[in-house]
């Protein structure tokens, strides 16, 4: 009887070991390098939308912006907490994909004051992080982002992003807050 119990226990452990050996290991933790790559990708995409607008017009820029939003933001996960720089009440916050798209490329009568932030002739985007906080499958960054337009004029904003790694391992922006730096003048 004792031999049978030991044999059954050993067999169970062997089967369990085999099952664990074949189980894929997935690391959902976000690294600093992934955050930096996502920020660079966001800036490059903004420039690409701006260039597309200049070369091919608003409909082409809108089509590209839709792809960028679908690839970079977490609207597929739920509402994104997006507070763009140049919005005002009652449309300050853009928790839907349609609201974000309108902010970037305009043309949506629901958001009549949107002129398309991504259509401003941006040629360079530079991110300077004050800090990046990493916590498993989420990461938060805060710092300044400077945008250089086709005339060389630089606009700098304070920016906070929160990224979440989705089930496919892609970083998604789930919080995006942007504001002009405070000036006492």
What residues fall within each predicted segment?
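Gram-negative bacterial Sec-dependent N-terminal signal peptides
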Residues: 1-21
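Short, low-complexity N-terminal intrinsically disordered segments enriched in polar/charged residues
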Residues: 20-72
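Mature soluble domains of exported/periplasmic/lumenal proteins and thiol-rich metal-chelating peptides
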Residues: 22-33, 106-112, 120-123, 185
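Short beta-strand segments enriched in hydrophobic/aromatic residues
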Residues: 46, 145-147, 177
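A solvent-exposed, acidic/Ser-Thr-rich amphipathic alpha-helical stretch
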Residues: 55-129
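Acidic, glycine-rich flexible loop segments
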Residues: 111-150, 157-159
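Short beta-strand edge/turn micro-motifs at domain boundaries
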Residues: 134-142, 151-184
């Amino acid at each position: 009887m004792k031999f049978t119990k030991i044999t059954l226990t050993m067999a169970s452990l062997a089967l369990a070991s085999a099952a664990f050996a074949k189980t894929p290991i997935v690391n959902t933790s976000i690294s600093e390098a992934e955050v930096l790559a996502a920020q660079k990708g966001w800036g490059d995409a903004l420039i690409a939308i701006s260039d597309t607008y200049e070369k091919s017009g608003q409909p082409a820029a809108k089509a590209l912006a839709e792809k960028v939003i679908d690839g970079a933001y977490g609207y597929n996960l739920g509402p994104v907490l997006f507070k763009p720089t140049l919005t005002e009440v009652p449309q300050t916050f853009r928790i839907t994909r349609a609201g974000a798209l309108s902010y970037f490329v305009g043309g949506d009568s629901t958001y009549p004051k949107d002129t398309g932030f991504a259509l401003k002739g941006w040629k360079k985007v530079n991110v300077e992080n004050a800090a990046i906080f990493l916590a498993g499958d989420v990461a938060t960054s805060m710092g300044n982002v400077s945008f250089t337009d086709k005339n060389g004029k630089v606009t700098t904003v304070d920016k906070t992003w929160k990224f979440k790694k989705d089930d496919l391992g892609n970083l998604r922006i789930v919080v995006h807050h942007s504001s002009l730096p405070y000036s006492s003048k």
